[in-house]
């Protein structure tokens, strides 16, 4: 009797719950698969749907690149999963991505996860559609015109030089990633939002911490309860909005008083455009647009600038080639060391630009983009059902691109060939593509070129830990924060 009781207890406490759990998982997957379009003969992509309701969101959040690499190796360039509360198809490879990026408004439409839309705002450029997207994009593009970029250069150069001097004065190693986030945050606050340097010093620490909290919880389960990721993200967002609102009101007041400015920052241009528009931005829309600019203008550039320090620290011959290119422009009379840079000079630094392109190829700061299927369509023999999310992967597309020989190696020279760049339109997509291509890509290129010129002209550096392990969340970064020792460089 005792043995029988023990067996029953074992079955009830261990075996039965396991069987019920497995049955629930199977029923969940069957429920998801039943949502296919019966009018389409093509099968769903291979893959798994994970746990009921949660899907595979937790594995993605906890494992990121390891999880995505395992999925790609197992299922190939198109597979189904369940992420952030929605059935999802992940897509990679130039031909597949081309169909998604060029299918905007016909096959797919942009749709970021609910948590992203809630925190950043549903009316931001990345979340609106049609005419509204076209008008907002046109307004924001004014802030990234060639003339605007020319006016931004002195501010960028000043902030970069100041940061480099601080790094050189430190006896110990510099944690590059946190320092880079501070630097890019200051640049974005001044150029994109028009904060004064004194104001940045006062609010910087609180704003950086709030922004970190917001970014950390940007991709979370859409559950707004105390202490949830979404709750913490919204609380941080509200603090950022309060500081931005103060600045917006000050700008409107200065504009009414016709106070002269040295240059017009991106937010000022948005305010002016709104006043002339038939559909002016509300204060809330202004705050959301400014927050989006701040995210796009500093989080991604901080990631790429950190990767630049890493790759050049591991490939010192590239540093020397950048220096030689700059010296060539000095000898041609186009540049005097220590003086101001210009758009004309930056355009001429072809190899320096290739170093940035190669960095973006291996470590694109943003791993991919989100879309939703507007109707059921076929992609490479598989059915993509209407209403399912589609994630196109930038990093995986770069990884599987055959147009890049020796793709594991850091070789900026590969981009010196114009033919390669022309022939790799959808094999190389660090800024996305189609009508949703990053509006600030030219600003990012200018900023990163200035950073690279100043860094190589003033510094030598050694990575304390060698090649770091990289993690994504939501942009790519080194898990050890890239401790680096900087020393002064003196040209012979």
UniProtKB/Swiss-Prot annotation:
It is found in: Endoplasmic reticulum membrane; Microsome membrane. It comes from the Eukaryota. It holds the Pfam family p450. It catalyses: all-trans-retinoate + reduced [NADPH--hemoprotein reductase] + O2 = all-trans-(4S)-hydroxyretinoate + oxidized [NADPH--hemoprotein reductase] + H2O + H(+). Heme binds at residue 438. It is a peripheral membrane protein. A cytochrome P450 monooxygenase involved in the metabolism of all-trans retinoic acid (atRA), a signaling molecule that binds to retinoic acid receptors and regulates gene transcription. Mechanistically, uses molecular oxygen inserting one oxygen atom into a substrate, and reducing the second into a water molecule, with two electrons provided by NADPH via cytochrome P450 reductase (CPR; NADPH-ferrihemoprotein reductase). Has no activity toward 9-cis and 13-cis retinoic acid stereoisomers. Belongs to the cytochrome P450 family. This is Cytochrome P450 26A1. Keywords: Endoplasmic reticulum, Heme, Iron, Lipid metabolism, Membrane, Metal-binding, Microsome, Monooxygenase, Oxidoreductase. One of its GO terms (biological process) is retinoic acid receptor signaling pathway. It is an enzyme of class 1 (oxidoreductase). GO terms for cellular component: endoplasmic reticulum membrane. It comes from Danio rerio. One of its GO terms (molecular function) is heme binding. Induction: By retinoic acid. The keyword Lipid biosynthesis does not apply. Transmembrane segments: none annotated.
